[in-house]
Amino acid sequence: MKGNFYQVDIPYKLVLAIDDNQVIGHVAVYLRDVYLDSFPETIGILSCVVVAHKYRGKGVAASLIKRAHAILKEHSVNFSILFAVSHAYYLSSGYIPMKNLTRFIENNEKKEFIYDGGMVCELGSQNWNVNILELNGEVV
């Protein structure tokens, strides 16, 4: 990736995978105060899961996600969400498709829809029984 990618928020943590003093992968970890069906909750959002091409298929992304989940659990976060182009990979890391309405802001405009790429992972003892996820701002 090139350029100023983190245009909305700077991640809470950036988890790196390093081999031979080179970054070979990373995932951005965000903590976000949201509303789940009108109830306040802090959730985790994972973004920018990237692994260098020659390291793909070797468990690097799974290790990054596992570490990101550990960080979120340290903050008693019950849910981690992400927005994926393809669900296939993230299913093996415990994510399931979200079927709820998501509200957010994009280009200073309020939007809402059910996003096919939205996925959630239950990190705590609570179940994701959410009808409306209010992100209280822009999508990362």
Language model: regions and residue ranges:
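A short, internal acetyl-CoA/4′-phosphopantetheine-binding micro-motif in the GNAT/acyltransferase core
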Residues: L46-R56, V85
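Conserved acetyl-CoA-binding loop-helix of GNAT-fold acetyltransferases
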Residues: V51, G57-A70
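Short loop segments at secondary-structure junctions
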Residues: D19-Q22, K54, E122-Q126
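Short coil/turn motifs at secondary-structure junctions
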Residues: R32-V34, K54, H87
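Short acidic (Asp/Glu) patches
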Residues: Y30-L31, L64-A68, K99-E106
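A conserved beta-strand-loop-helix scaffold within acyl/acetyltransferase catalytic domains
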Residues: M1-V50
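Conserved active-site alpha-helix within GNAT-family acetyltransferase domains
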Residues: E74-F79, A84-E109
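C-terminal "cap" of GNAT-fold acetyltransferases
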Residues: F104-V140
